[in-house]
Amino acid sequence: MLAAFQLTVLALIATSFLMVIGVPVIFASPEGWVKSKNFVFSGALLWISLVFAVGILNSFVV
């Protein structure tokens, strides 16, 4: 269970890093929002899911 928790935290950190870098680049590029809207929404959904997964797994690890 500890390994699953650690991998989920690692995925959350990686997703957060990609979103912090990717979203401003998308907004800065011409017509970036129109073409990359699905990337932003998919990344946000993945990030929210990982936050809940970390919270749930944390209750099993502690």
Swiss-Prot record:
Disulfide bonds: none annotated. It is a multi-pass membrane protein. GO terms for cellular component: chloroplast thylakoid membrane; photosystem II reaction center. One of its GO terms (biological process) is photosystem II stabilization. The chain crosses the membrane at residues 8-28, 41-61. Keywords: Chloroplast, Membrane, Photosynthesis, Photosystem II, Plastid, Reaction center, Thylakoid, Transmembrane, Transmembrane helix. It is found in: Plastid, Chloroplast thylakoid membrane. SUPFAM superfamilies: PsbZ-like. PSII is composed of 1 copy each of membrane proteins PsbA, PsbB, PsbC, PsbD, PsbE, PsbF, PsbH, PsbI, PsbJ, PsbK, PsbL, PsbM, PsbT, PsbY, PsbZ, Psb30/Ycf12, at least 3 peripheral proteins of the oxygen-evolving complex and a large number of cofactors. It forms dimeric complexes. Belongs to the PsbZ family. May control the interaction of photosystem II (PSII) cores with the light-harvesting antenna, regulates electron flow through the 2 photosystem reaction centers. PSII is a light-driven water plastoquinone oxidoreductase, using light energy to abstract electrons from H(2)O, generating a proton gradient subsequently used for ATP formation. This is Photosystem II reaction center protein Z. It comes from Mesostigma viride. The lineage of its organism: Eukaryota, Viridiplantae, Streptophyta, Mesostigmatophyceae, Mesostigmatales. The gene is psbZ.
